[in-house]
Amino acid sequence: MDFSLTEEQELLLASIRELITTNFPEEYFRTCDQNGTYPREFMRALADNGISMLGVPEEFGGIPADYVTQMLALMEVSKCGAPAFLITNGQCIHSMRRFGSAEQLRKTAESTLETGDPAYALALTEPGAGSDNNSATTTYTRKNGKVYINGQKTFITGAKEYPYMLVLARDPQPKDPKKAFTLWWVDSSKPGIKINPLHKIGWHMLSTCEVYLDNVEVEESDMVGEEGMGFLNVMYNFEMERLINAARSTGFAECAFEDAARYANQRIAFGKPIGHNQMIQEKLALMAIKIDNMRNMVLKVAWQADQHQSLRTSAALAKLYCARTAMEVIDDAIQIMGGLGYTDEARVSRFWRDVRCERIGGGTDEIMIYVAGRQILKDYQNK
């Protein structure tokens, strides 16, 4: 088994490091975080340099790359301390290529190329329907050749920043109850839409919002994918999202580890660097083991994606392990850095707030255990 990177991958990671460290120092991200400002300059730079468009076909303004390369790049972005949770450009385009119309794909690609930002927010969750999307009550109805969407969504990431939303809505009278949900392409500026940002522990650089839809009018052509297939399309989206979650968690953990190791060499206590103490050495050694495990897990699942293998179990386990373990590593980094680690002057405190979301978004830890555990039992039922 060859663990070495290709020359192209080495050059890509070096270019990411140079771009971020040269143009976007920690002070930039700290200011955006403290002010709740979306870092448009950063996103524009990623798009202009092709980083946020990796894996997207050239015809849509992207750079072809396999999933292993994409995950290496994503880990490198967060390893540099940058908010990798903003990068869903390629994911948006991939979803539209899989089940969107030609016009929806065109809008997605053009919007992303023009702004550098993802084109749409995914509006799934509702006050009474989080992990259980089947309980969603937002409806779509037809009248006089138009379609009207009514309901409330919550915890919608990027609803304030992105120009469009993909809204999961229920047919109140479906012919087949198993095919009640359909995705709709909705312009966020349409009449009847009200967006209220929520205040959060972390992810301050990107809004998370309540979205109210009151008789929002859309066209039949705004249907995304086949009618009644919305839930299945969402499930496809989740598997790749979970791998992405795992990759960016891993990068943040690695950045926190490196900050803690440098601090342990520099901080003098009782006449010597604190890194000379065996308790600090033990923490760093265990952190290094965890990071190695996380990286290997992410790259294995990415390889499986490149081989067109099912990611149902492996992506769920990767997200579960990496999100939990990243929190452990970052928490240990804060402990090593002491009081400084608990202040906004140290970026590990931002990582601690931001990575905590990874244990919730894209499927909670508990749902990941359920998804993986159920599939494992099924796989061994007749063995």
Swiss-Prot record:
Pfam families recorded? Acyl-CoA_dh_1, Acyl-CoA_dh_M, Acyl-CoA_dh_N
Keyword Iron-sulfur present in the record's keywords: the answer is no
Residue stretches spanning the membrane: none
What this protein needs as a cofactor is:
FAD
Which GO terms are recorded in the biological process aspect for this UniProt protein?
1-butanol biosynthetic process; fatty acid beta-oxidation using acyl-CoA dehydrogenase
Q: What is its EC number?
A: 1.3.-.-
Q: Which family does it belong to?
A: Belongs to the acyl-CoA dehydrogenase family.
- Name of this protein: Probable acyl-CoA dehydrogenase YdiO
> To which species is this protein native?
Escherichia coli (strain K12)
User: Gene name, please?
Assistant: ydiO
